[in-house]
Amino acid sequence: NIDQSFPGFHGSEMWNPNTDLSEDCLYLNVWIPAPKPKNATVLIWIYGGGFQTGTSSLHVYDGKFLARVERVIVVSMNYRVGALGFLALPGNPEAPGNMGLFDQQLALQWVQKNIAAFGGNPKSVTLFGESAGAASVSLHL
């Protein structure tokens, strides 16, 4: 395991290739301001990476500050990327393509069904992202 980060160079650690990743990746992160809100706006973050790389667990994507300062609930999701998420083999039901987008859709459905238990308003949800995450937002509209 080679450490390819550059300590002291701002922003370099966020792309550290030594971040633990797994095919078992369908997880959500939920940040709630204290005290627990009632009917709060929900912001859902989708990370970028060209649909090839990325994870919501990078420190730069920590939603606790946004949740605390703006009194909103912040949710981020992981989804399959690369061949596991976007390989399409026409005629092969085991690789229909765009599985990463279906992972995102599943996360969005989960938020709609469960966010009220966290103090969120399922009718006040905003999607946002960068790069492939922003493209994903447009694909879900």
UniProtKB/Swiss-Prot annotation:
Its EC number is 3.1.1.8. Keywords: Disulfide bond, Glycoprotein, Hydrolase, Phosphoprotein, Secreted, Serine esterase. The active site is at 131 (acyl-ester intermediate). Glycans are attached at residue 39. Present in most cells except erythrocytes. It is an enzyme of class 3 (hydrolase). It catalyses: an acylcholine + H2O = a carboxylate + choline + H(+). One of its GO terms (cellular component) is extracellular region. InterPro entries: AB_hydrolase_fold, AChE-related_enzymes, CarbesteraseB, Carboxylesterase_B_AS, Carboxylesterase_B_CS, Cholinesterase. Substrate binds at residues 49-50. Its main location: secreted. The keyword Calcium does not apply. It is found in: Secreted. Pfam families: COesterase. The modification Phosphoserine is found at residue 131. GO terms for molecular function: acetylcholinesterase activity; cholinesterase activity. Belongs to the type-B carboxylesterase/lipase family. Esterase with broad substrate specificity. Contributes to the inactivation of the neurotransmitter acetylcholine. Can degrade neurotoxic organophosphate esters. Homotetramer; disulfide-linked. Dimer of dimers. This is Cholinesterase.
